[in-house]
Amino acid sequence: CHWKNKDGVDIYGYGGDFNKYDGSDNNFNDNGLISPDRVPNPHAYEVAYFYQDIWTTPADLAKGEINIFNEYFFRDLSAYYMEWQLLANGEVVQTGIVSDLKVAPQQTVKVQLPIDTKNICPCKELLLNVSYKLKAAETLLPAGTAIAYEQLSIRDYKAPELKLENVQASNLPVIVPSILDNDQNYLIVKGENFSMDFNKHNGYLCRYDVNGMQMMEDGSELTPNFWRAPTDNDFGAGLQRKYAVWKNPELKLTSLRHAVENDQAVVRAEYDMKSVGGKLFLTYTINNKGAVKVTQRMEADKSKKVSEMFRFGMQMRMPVNFNEVEYYGRGPVENYSDRNHGAKLGKYRQTVEEQFYPYIRPQ
């Protein structure tokens, strides 16, 4: 219910928020499909996907052949039309409409779409989106409402090898980044249009300016990260305690080296992680335009009995004016690795605020 906490801030309360003596299911009755402000939770879209009554499966996608199954018991699909899109790395390259769907109840029909993949780069991921829409309005649903959809993979994504090369204009020499090691606190890498500072006491990248633009928030550092906020299920399994050693493990800098290799600046930092029985290695490769490739590698002592970790990555804070995100992945709704059927692969552009969903209690 709508509630105010002890500081007078509006919150959505659940069992246990009101007193300590009444029987309660805690947040168990507050994790449904619709939030108290009547906004669908992201998992509502997952449920909607599985509630649909028209299912599309591949027959021979290389030939554009798909199977359409009508799960309805008492109506055919004549009230709907199908829109399809062919996507290459998230970009729509072909579209079409099938207006006559002759599929009886509980029957499957094969349909051939005029898909042509011959002139599409073989390195790109190919996806087929299909959507079934109403030809005419029905009760509360206007004409054109999508009542079922599917996304089929024609060609899987192949991640390119992550290479960092210098950018060379025609007939102009490459200006190799210089490394300044005459400051007591900072190792500085300078290029034609960029400057980067590494903290000599912990080895972390702590300043990154390109073309006069500050890429990192003042006081921020690019640091290793092995933690995320535990979810409700994590708490139920006690993972916040089992994995606690990874929340802020000690990272003792044992080596900070630098060199110019292949006309690029390279900074290497090594760390001892006694609390988890491991060693961490960070390598920063910087080209002539200030682009950075960061590699993080960990060596674990197999004789040490250490818990698993929530995640393995890096984090930093960016200036507030970096408030838009463009990505190729699942969206536009928030989704998990095991709850993403309702989120299609595509190219999406969102604000940072739109990337966040305020779960009352993340499950």
Residue ranges, per PLM feature:
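Short amphipathic, basic-aromatic surface patches that mediate peripheral association
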Residues: 70-74, 300-302
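Beta-strand/loop-rich accessory regions of lumenal/periplasmic or secreted enzymes
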Residues: 114-123, 138, 153-363
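Extended substrate-binding grooves/exosites of carbohydrate-active enzymes
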Residues: 1-65, 73-78, 83-93
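Conserved, mostly hydrophobic/aromatic
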Residues: 47, 68, 130, 193, ...
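Short, hydrophobic/aromatic beta-strand segments
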Residues: 75-82, 96, 304-313
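Exposed beta-strand and adjacent loop surfaces of beta-rich binding modules
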Residues: 63, 79-83, 127, 186, ...
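Edge beta-strands of extracellular beta-sandwich domains
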Residues: 139-152
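Intrinsically disordered, low-complexity Pro/Gly/Ser/Thr-rich segments with frequent PxxP/GP/PP motifs
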Residues: 81, 87-124, 132, 140
